[in-house]
Amino acid sequence: MNLDQAEITALTKRFETPFYLYDGDFIEAHYRQLRSRTNPAIQFYLSLKANNNIHLAKLFRQWGLGVEVASAGELALARHAGFSAENIIFSGPGKKRSELEIAVQSGIYCIIAESVEELFYIEELAEKENKTARVAIRINPDKSFGSTAIKMGGVPRQFGMDESMLDAVMDAVRSLQFTKFIGIHVYTGTQNLNTDSIIESMKYTVDLGRNIYERYGIVCECINLGGGFGVPYFSHEKALDIGKITRTVSDYVQEARDTRFPQTTFIIESGRYLLAQAAVYVTEVLYRKASKGEVFVIVDGGMHHHAASTFRGRSMRSNYPMEYIPVREDSGRRELEKVTIAGPLCTPEDCLGKDVHVPALYPGDLVCVLNSGAYGLSFSPVHFLGHPTPIEILKRNGSYELIRRKGTADDIVATQLQTESNLLFVDK
């Protein structure tokens, strides 16, 4: 996404900061390029956790993607976005029975079971509903695949079932009467910028499907290759060779379809790669101050809206890329200075930029955080200190659409019961 400073400045005259601005044309072009490079036998599924705005999800539905959800709430959001049940998969290591019941009742394409106990819960619920539930099993592979920002497989994790347990898992699968086994899922990590490790993991997943056929005589109807495609947030990071990934994985999938899996659906999940670079988070400078020889610039947005870009939970890290828009009438040439850019919250973790070199910033100027389309608002502690949720704006085909209103105090208290009549019991 290219930042147009005049456009951003004009929007701040109509909409109160902070806000997110998404470039819908960029999102579409980015996805269609990925789609055009990839074997048609591979379907893409949007990971809703990366951004749960239903207006963005609707665009991906219109472009033919399925959706991956990880809670009953995300399942409801997916249905509100218009996704049909047969285009929804449900993952997550800790699904409650009530959530599994909703998934079974909804008839979604696939529940990704992450333990043998979960398989039996699904079977019990399917029998109760007199329905056939469709499941895939998530496998934690015996092998680890190179470096990735957050490892989710190939090491001890709460996700999935160890590959070494496959005999016991398949014994459980064979015992199911109301639950249909349709395939496997492997997801080894997120924010992965290692091209070769992604390729290796996806090829390994295809081979696991072959092994299941050879050992157990079961053909996988669905092989979920995972995803985890990363984007370079910081100057020291290099972009994936996405052409190499799509070309190599497409060829490997085609070979598998030609030899063993002619009817199998292959899936790649993506959220960050599809959305991260398509948005900017716009904040306004409220104050500038000095403390013990350092300059602090206080802006009106921060950790409560965009936790991933702040210092929350990290002692050492890099700053997200930012651009600065001088708005004051006297904003001529300004000298560079080293500052810390902090948000409005009562915690030192609410820091958008530490020791950044910027043109001198004053109240009314704008600080824009780039690469903010994924794991922004959906990943943030929005209730902390009671600030309103930010506006979200979608730009598409030269028009602007408000896709999330500014939050209110009523939103904060909406789920909090207000009367004494809510007393449930007295513990004596």
UniProtKB/Swiss-Prot annotation:
Q: Which CDD domains match?
A: PLPDE_III_Btrk_like
Pfam families listed in its UniProt record: Orn_Arg_deC_N, Orn_DAP_Arg_deC
Required cofactor(s): pyridoxal 5'-phosphate
- EC number(s) of the enzyme? 4.1.1.95
- Summarize where pyridoxal 5'-phosphate binds, as residue positions: G228, E269, S270, G271, R272, Y375
The reaction(s) this protein catalyses: gamma-L-glutamyl-[BtrI ACP] + H(+) = 4-aminobutanoyl-[BtrI ACP] + CO2
State the Gene Ontology BP annotations. Answer: antibiotic biosynthetic process; lysine biosynthetic process via diaminopimelate
Q: Which InterPro entries match?
A: Ala_racemase/Decarboxylase_C (IPR009006), DAP_deCOOHase_LysA (IPR002986), De-COase2_C (IPR022643), De-COase2_CS (IPR022657), De-COase2_N (IPR022644), Orn/DAP/Arg_de-COase (IPR000183), PLP-binding_barrel (IPR029066)
Q: Which UniProt keywords apply?
A: Antibiotic biosynthesis, Decarboxylase, Lyase, Pyridoxal phosphate
Is Coiled coil one of the keywords?
Answer: no
GO molecular function terms here? carboxy-lyase activity; diaminopimelate decarboxylase activity; protein homodimerization activity
Instruction: PTM N6-(pyridoxal phosphate)lysine: list the residues.
Output: K49
Protein's UniProt keywords contain Lyase:
yes
Where on this chain does substrate bind? R272, Y375
Q: In which pathway does it act?
A: Antibiotic biosynthesis; butirosin biosynthesis
Query: Which domain of life does the protein's organism represent?
Result: Bacteria
Give the family, as the similarity comment puts it.
Belongs to the Orn/Lys/Arg decarboxylase class-II family.
Known partners and oligomeric status: Homodimer.
Question: What does this chain do?
Answer: Pyridoxal phosphate-dependent decarboxylase that catalyzes 1 step in the biosynthesis of the side chain of the aminoglycoside antibiotics in the biosynthetic pathway of butirosin. Able to decarboxylate L-ornithine, L-arginine, L-lysine, but not L-glutamate or any D-amino acids. Has low activity with substrates not bound to an acyl-carrier protein.
Q: What is this protein called?
A: L-glutamyl-[BtrI acyl-carrier protein] decarboxylase
Which source organism does the UniProt entry give?
A: Niallia circulans (Bacillus circulans)
Upper taxonomic classification of the species? Bacteria, Bacillati, Bacillota, Bacilli, Bacillales
